[in-house]
């Protein structure tokens, strides 16, 4: 699991994303810490919020589950990559349930294909 303190030590000071049960311990850490944090209604919105924070000098992190990757492809390719704005993506990996199987097989390859490299895929027992 990703530890909030490591990200804070790395200069990350703003967090946004869509709640995910697999990332619950990480999200709970964010909420309990009191750092700047906005819960987004969808993954694309979270990217937009993070870009806004980056534009005012806040190193940002977006959390989501990999089933939401489809919602961030356009914001990444039309906003983040062309303008060299790369918030960290913390992605909960889901891959066993039918509705998560396809994205669970291609999540890493999809991000590599579009050239986005600032991400962590969190695999584990909680991310079924």
Q: For the regions a protein language model found, what residue spans apply to each?
A:
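Thiamine diphosphate
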Residues: 1-128
């Amino acid at each position: 699991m990703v530890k909030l303190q490591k990200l804070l030590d790395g200069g990350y000071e703003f967090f946004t994303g869509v709640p995910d049960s697999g990332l619950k311990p990480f999200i709970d850490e964010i909420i309990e810490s009191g750092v700047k944090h906005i819960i987004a209604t969808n993954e694309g919105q979270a990217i937009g919020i993070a870009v806004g924070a980056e534009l005012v000098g806040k190193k940002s992190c977006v959390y989501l589950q990999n089933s939401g990757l489809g919602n961030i492809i356009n914001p990444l390719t039309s906003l983040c990559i062309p303008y060299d704005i790369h918030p960290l993506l913390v992605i909960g990996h889901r891959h066993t349930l039918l509705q998560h199987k396809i994205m669970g097989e291609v999540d890493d390859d999809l991000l590599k294909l579009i050239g986005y490299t600032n991400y962590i895929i969190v695999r584990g027992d909680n991310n079924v």
